[in-house]
Amino acid sequence: MIFEHALVLSAFLFSIGIYGLITSRNMVRALMCLELILNAVNINLVTFSDFFDRRQLKGNIFSIFVIAVAAAEAAIGPAIVSSIYRNRKSTRINQSNLLNK
């Protein structure tokens, strides 16, 4: 893939993720947008690692760590959302004041 195309794709994914994270009112949608942002970061890491130094795999290895963090977030996030739904009967962000009881 050409360097500029990968950066445009990454910027597009990152923009969609940020827009969705800012405008979403549902926790599940916010988690999905966060995954889009993390995938855009991974594309950037791999692209810059390939473009600047092909012999060292620092960007690729760091993207594997980001994927591991995203996998943990994908496992823990829905569990937290389902727990909030059981207690509050809603997954809307503006209705879940967890500090107030």
Swiss-Prot record:
<comment type="subunit">
    <text>NDH is composed of at least 16 different subunits, 5 of which are encoded in the nucleus.</text>
</comment>
<keyword id="KW-0934">Plastid</keyword>
<protein>
    <recommendedName>
        <fullName>NAD(P)H-quinone oxidoreductase subunit 4L, chloroplastic</fullName>
        <ecNumber>7.1.1.-</ecNumber>
    </recommendedName>
</protein>
<dbReference type="GO" id="GO:0048038">
    <property type="term" value="F:quinone binding"/>
</dbReference>
<feature type="transmembrane region" description="Helical">
    <location>
        <begin position="32"/>
        <end position="52"/>
    </location>
</feature>
<feature type="transmembrane region" description="Helical">
    <location>
        <begin position="2"/>
        <end position="22"/>
    </location>
</feature>
<feature type="transmembrane region" description="Helical">
    <location>
        <begin position="61"/>
        <end position="81"/>
    </location>
</feature>
<comment type="similarity">
    <text>Belongs to the complex I subunit 4L family.</text>
</comment>
<dbReference type="GO" id="GO:0042773">
    <property type="term" value="P:ATP synthesis coupled electron transport"/>
</dbReference>
<keyword id="KW-0472">Membrane</keyword>
<dbReference type="InterPro" id="IPR039428">
    <property type="entry name" value="NUOK/Mnh_C1-like"/>
</dbReference>
<keyword id="KW-0150">Chloroplast</keyword>
<keyword id="KW-1133">Transmembrane helix</keyword>
<keyword id="KW-0812">Transmembrane</keyword>
<dbReference type="GO" id="GO:0009535">
    <property type="term" value="C:chloroplast thylakoid membrane"/>
</dbReference>
<comment type="function">
    <text>NDH shuttles electrons from NAD(P)H:plastoquinone, via FMN and iron-sulfur (Fe-S) centers, to quinones in the photosynthetic chain and possibly in a chloroplast respiratory chain. The immediate electron acceptor for the enzyme in this species is believed to be plastoquinone. Couples the redox reaction to proton translocation, and thus conserves the redox energy in a proton gradient.</text>
</comment>
<keyword id="KW-0793">Thylakoid</keyword>
<dbReference type="GO" id="GO:0016655">
    <property type="term" value="F:oxidoreductase activity, acting on NAD(P)H, quinone or similar compound as acceptor"/>
</dbReference>
<keyword id="KW-0618">Plastoquinone</keyword>
<keyword id="KW-0520">NAD</keyword>
<dbReference type="InterPro" id="IPR001133">
    <property type="entry name" value="NADH_UbQ_OxRdtase_chain4L/K"/>
</dbReference>
<keyword id="KW-0813">Transport</keyword>
<keyword id="KW-1278">Translocase</keyword>
<dbReference type="GO" id="GO:0030964">
    <property type="term" value="C:NADH dehydrogenase complex"/>
</dbReference>
<keyword id="KW-0521">NADP</keyword>
<dbReference type="Pfam" id="PF00420">
    <property type="entry name" value="Oxidored_q2"/>
</dbReference>
<keyword id="KW-0874">Quinone</keyword>
<dbReference type="GO" id="GO:0019684">
    <property type="term" value="P:photosynthesis, light reaction"/>
</dbReference>
